């Protein structure tokens, strides 16, 4: 899938604009602070109903405007189009529309418009808390395993019930046992989907990484959230007193993690910034390959400040891999000349100059 058209109104400093992007490579260039990243933010808002720059949406809404709106016409992989719209009012009201109908959740957007973001904060995938890596993992499972979301919802409900009981002791023993059983069943299902996904992801990630950078010995492993040699019901029983003292369930899929190690060390502790960026890119690109295999469609990639942290050789290698995905890519940079040699002649490349919130399409830089 790809965006055929996108209309942006009152997003940060951007002037109202309608863009008809290339189905492949789109480069947004201009000075720092011109609004390039705000274009990526608008696409992200359309696909996930949230910003990647702020946990609050009020800062996204242009000063003195009551609401921001993003509309997109999506070319579907199976043919035909779908119209998506997201509107956020400063007062807090949020509207998601899909083909003229109100949507119930942002998950419906995510299914229609799978997005991959690579930006300066992407280092957090390696350096940050396990929650960030779980989100990465579950994004991938969600897009390849249709049974994942119902199981995840059951898991969340069972966890809420158990944690409430741990804090307040409001469940009778029979109800407590029933919710523990439901928690264990949902956990086993989630764990199976995650393990299968990692099994498929690892060889694709390793191959992709080898085309970007030489990092012999880097390993990716999955920790499910409890001892691999014990059943979860046994772990829950043995940790009950501790769970009651803490007020929440300590073992289970909600504690899962992905571990990247190099020479027995946490990879984030010894890799340079450039190497970390390439590892994250390899993970994101590998996910895109799995989405394409499972759905016969493509992710849309948002790459903020692609040239940063990378020398010319690695910039070219990253551009080549993004190009080989045959998906739609939106890239920001200050100097588009740095990407001049990154693409094959036959690949459609659209250039957009961004200056003080105004966006102008310019000529293909290879012409």
UniProtKB/Swiss-Prot annotation:
ATP binds at residues 30-37. One of its GO terms (molecular function) is single-stranded DNA binding. Pfam families: SMC_N. GO terms for biological process: DNA replication; DNA synthesis involved in DNA repair; double-strand break repair; SOS response. The keyword Isomerase does not apply. It is found in: Cytoplasm. InterPro entries: DNA-binding_RecF (IPR001238), DNA-binding_RecF_CS (IPR018078), P-loop_NTPase (IPR027417), RecF/RecN/SMC_N (IPR003395), RecF_2 (IPR042174). One of its GO terms (cellular component) is cytoplasm. Its main location: cytoplasm. Keywords: ATP-binding, Cytoplasm, DNA damage, DNA repair, DNA replication, DNA-binding, Nucleotide-binding, SOS response. The RecF protein is involved in DNA metabolism; it is required for DNA replication and normal SOS inducibility. RecF binds preferentially to single-stranded, linear DNA. It also seems to bind ATP. Belongs to the RecF family. This is DNA replication and repair protein RecF.
